[in-house]
Design a protein with these regions (language model features):
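Glycine-rich phosphate-binding loops of nucleotide-dependent enzymes
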Residues: 1-172
Length: 172
C-alpha cells in the first residue's frame, strides 16, 4: 500500500497471465502439507476475476497471457493492479499514448475511478484536452521546473501552451 506506476510503454510481463501480472512480486502463498509454501494460483484466479468484474474490464477470460491483449486492455491490467493493492498514489505516465479512442476513454474512466476510491493520481501527459478532462489541478513544467499550477476548471488550453513553450513571462 504505497505508490504504483502505470507506464506509457505498457510495462507488463508479456508471457504471464493477467493475474500473475497483478500479483507479480506479491504472490499469495499457501502451505502444502502445512509446511511447503507454494503460490496460491486458485486465489490469484478468483481475486483477478473479481477485480476485472469490479473495473468492468473488457479483458476476455480466454486471454492466457497479456501479450494477447490490446493496449487498452494492458493498461487496464496495470490500473487494476494499482486498485487491488490500494495504492495511495498512482503515477500515470502518458497512460493513453498510442491507444484507440475507445481504449483511451476506458483508461480515463479507470483513472477517475482510482481518484474516487481515494488514490492521489499524478497524470502525466501532453494531450491537454485529456488532461483538462481528467485533472482537478494542473501543473505545467518547462525546462524541468514547475512554472504554473492552477485548477483545471480555471484553465484553458491556450494558457497552458504558453507556459509549456516558455512564451509566458513567468516561464522564462
Amino acid at each position: 500500500m504505497g505508490i504504483e506506476t502505470v507506464y506509457q510503454d505498457l510495462a507488463l510481463a508479456d508471457d504471464l497471465s493477467v493475474g500473475a501480472n497483478i500479483f507479480l512480486g506479491r504472490e499469495p502463498v499457501r502451505r502444502l502439507f502445512g509446511v511447503l509454501p507454494i503460490i496460491d494460483n486458485g486465489r490469484i484466479r478468483r481475486e483477478t476475476q473479481a477485480l476485472l468484474a469490479r473495473i468492468e474490464s473488457r479483458i476476455p477470460p480466454s486471454a492466457r497471457t497479456v501479450s494477447r491483449l490490446s493496449g487498452g486492455q494492458r493498461q487496464a491490467v496495470s490500473i487494476a493492479r494499482a486498485l487491488y493493492w490500494q495504492a495511495k498514489v498512482v503515477i500515470m505516465d502518458e497512460p493513453t499514448a498510442a491507444l484507440a479512442a475507445m481504449e483511451r476513454e476506458h483508461v480515463i474512466q479507470l483513472a477517475r475511478r482510482l481518484a474516487s476510491e481515494g488514490a492521489g493520481v499524478i497524470y502525466i501527459g501532453h494531450n491537454l484536452i485529456e488532461i483538462l478532462e481528467v485533472a482537478d489541478r494542473v501543473a505545467v513544467m518547462y525546462r524541468g521546473r514547475i512554472v504554473h499550477v492552477t485548477q483545471a476548471s480555471d484553465s484553458h488550453q491556450e494558457e497552458l501552451i504558453k507556459y509549456m513553450t516558455g512564451f509566458n513571462s513567468a516561464a522564462a
